[in-house]
Amino acid sequence: MMKVSVIVPIYNAASTIQACIESILNQSEDDLELILVDDGSTDESGAICDTYIEKDQRVRVIHQKNKGRTAARWAGVQQSSGEWITFVDADDMLPVDALQALCKGINDDTDIVFGNGYSLSPETRISIPIEEFRHLAVRADGMIGVPWGSLYRRTVVTEYLFDLPRHIMMGEDYIYWLRLVFATEKPVSIVYERVYDKGDDHTSNIFEWTSDYCYELNEYRKSAVPVDYQDIYFDDMLSDRIANLFAVSVCRNRKEWINSRFYQEILTDLKIHHKSFSFKQRFFLAFPSLKLRAFIAKNLL
């Protein structure tokens, strides 16, 4: 069996896909297959991908109607054969030793090799117990919440991870991670070397967050945590919702923010569990003045 399957979902990435492909094929760890999923591109992306089929036998190309990035990733998983799976976005690149560094974290006692260890702390622990890592994942600490830059054992990468409606196109990676960390009981291996070079995510540049979207996204996030674990991770889940509210509220007008289901649900939960949260968090939510929110976010949080 191939060691690593690298899956790249592609949509109208003609200006970046060649550099992305070259960075993968030039890896020092060459026991890999590269699966390029052309998700209905209307530019030259698909044609560029096809030129690599004859150049390198490790390359496979899938052409499909446009279904969105999440569906494209799952299509790649279905056609892959590697024992381990990783994802790369079409506008990103891998440092030459990225896969080699990640593969050093592979062992029989892990299903996940987390390659963004530098984002958690300066520590050099080689693994983190799954219970502790779940707390980090639910709070979205560091770079947890992005599918790239890590390895996943094939047995835990199931269709359930990608089962989302197409319009959930921002924040969906976090749902993937939450579902993933509750699909294994094994410790998570940690890699601290640089394993990913991020490009520009043009989708995030044009996406407009709304309070209704935040509410729906949060419903999927909550459902990703199994019912038996909801009480254990409640504080972490609420902290993450507050953090998300801080992040998007500067773009919302005061009336919409105060009246939104997303805000009201957070406020209700915070009142019930107020002892678990800081004065700053409670004060921020209690006084939703735009100027006050901006001041607190800048100077206190």
Regions found by a protein language model. Name each.
Residues 22-31:
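Short, acidic, metal-binding catalytic loop of nucleotide-sugar glycosyltransferases
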Residues 134-213:
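Conserved nucleotide-sugar donor-binding catalytic segment
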Residues 23, 38-47:
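A conserved acidic beta->alpha catalytic loop
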Residues 185, 194-201, 206-270:
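Catalytic core of nucleotide-sugar-dependent glycosyltransferases
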Residues 64-80:
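Glycine-rich, basic loop-to-helix element that forms the pyrophosphate-binding segment
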Residues 85:
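Short aromatic/hydrophobic "clamp" motif used to bind/position activated sugar donors
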Residues 251-301:
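Membrane-interface aromatic/basic loop that binds lipid-linked glycans or pyrophosphate carriers
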Residues 95-163:
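Flexible acidic/His/Gly-enriched loops in nucleotide-sugar-dependent glycosyltransferase catalytic domains
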